[in-house]
Amino acid sequence: MPLYIHALACAFGLGSWVSINGLWVELPLIVNVLPEGWDLPSYLTVIIQFANLGPLLVTLAHKFCPGRLRENLAIYAVLSIGVVACILLAVFWNYTTVIFGQPRSTAFFILTFFLALVDCTSSVTFLPFMMQLPAKYITTYFIGEGLSGLVPGLVALAQGVGMSKCVNVTNVSDNVTDPGPSTFIVETQYLPPNFSTEIFFSFLAVMTTISLGAFLILNRLPRTFELSTENLVSDSDAVATVCRGLEDPMDPKTNCPEEVEQKQNEVLLPKPQHSSYQLAFIYVMVLWVNSATNGLLPSVQTFSCMPYGNMAYHLSAALSAVANPVACIIAMFFPKRSLVFLGILCLLGSTFGGYNMAMAAMSPCPLLQDTPLGDAIIVLSWVFFTGLLSYVKVMVGVILRDRSHSALVWCGAAVQTGSLLGSIIMFPLVNVYHLFKSGDICNTNCPL
């Protein structure tokens, strides 16, 4: 029976962020089809920030109507919406409508918003439900949550990416009386991947359905909830708790057993001491890291990677998705709380991010284009950028978690502020001022 519940807890956690993670790793195939092209990621970063309306509403409900919001019904709703949105996305993802004379991916954007709403809201509903189960199942839940980033990345690697080829196309005039000479142009054509985008989105729907099914069974299990240390998140799960991303700036789980136990023991357990300068450094680091990883760099990943080819972009997106949960696992087994060490990692990760941004600014003719070395460097740069800053995010969150509840609340606020600022800054630079230039593999002539 316990193994059965462990499997259910893992499957339940799998549905937390599988949809949005799946969208990001599928972008290398989508940007070649949808009219927004290379600008598409900048739209997604803004849409995801708007989707934080979900956890905000849940937080306000807990604040002003304590005890009125039934979390099991909220979970039913968000997972059901996720399943329906994934199914609709598999059918309508490439449907466009004309807005102000330009084709726009309206269906894709609307469905992406609902998927982001589901995943963001899961951050403030799934864990409170899991707190009703014994603590040993919470670790398994976090494993499933980590798999929500790992599994789509691995499936995307298995899917592959449509390789591009340059094809000569003859254009013949439609004028019958005076046809004129034929013109020859070179077009970029993309070969199909191992399986289609529709199948990939259907896979996301299946994963979300599995999560919903696991929750249905977990919610019907008989359970007794006692106010004891067995039902608390253990110290070994501290990293895993923070690894969820600290999506909500205000913790809705008031009066939970963990908080009661913490208040009972706060006199016995000494809190870590940091000077005001150290705390300022920590919060600036949180602000910067989340701005870079959730807004600034994702908005220009296409411009950074696509000039090196579809394969480079595909590997960068998929391996970066894998690097995030791997960094969380490393943080669980090798936690380092030294601010000097974390500052060095932040600087190193930011250096890789700076290289990625520089290549995006140089698009469509970045350094070492059309060379195996250039392809390898850009892929590794994105992987190290994501992995290093993910480790920093987790460990900084752990430091603030051990300090106090209010410190963790301010950490969540810094996470959201940084992510929002990064998205807002990049959107006009990409879509209004067009500082980043897209290109075509077959028709872009770069100086030697």
Curated annotation (Swiss-Prot):
Membrane topology according to the record: Multi-pass membrane protein
UniProt subcellular location: Cell membrane
GO biological process: riboflavin transport
Catalytic activity: riboflavin(in) = riboflavin(out)
GO cellular component, one term: plasma membrane
Residues with glycosylation annotation: N94, N168, N171, N175, N194
Pfam families: SLC52_ribofla_tr (PF06237)
Family in the record: Belongs to the riboflavin transporter family.
Function: Plasma membrane transporter mediating the uptake by cells of the water soluble vitamin B2/riboflavin that plays a key role in biochemical oxidation-reduction reactions of the carbohydrate, lipid, and amino acid metabolism.
PANTHER family: SOLUTE CARRIER FAMILY 52, SOLUTE CARRIER FAMILY 52, RIBOFLAVIN TRANSPORTER, MEMBER 3
Name this polypeptide is given: Solute carrier family 52, riboflavin transporter, member 3-A
Gene encoding the protein: slc52a3a
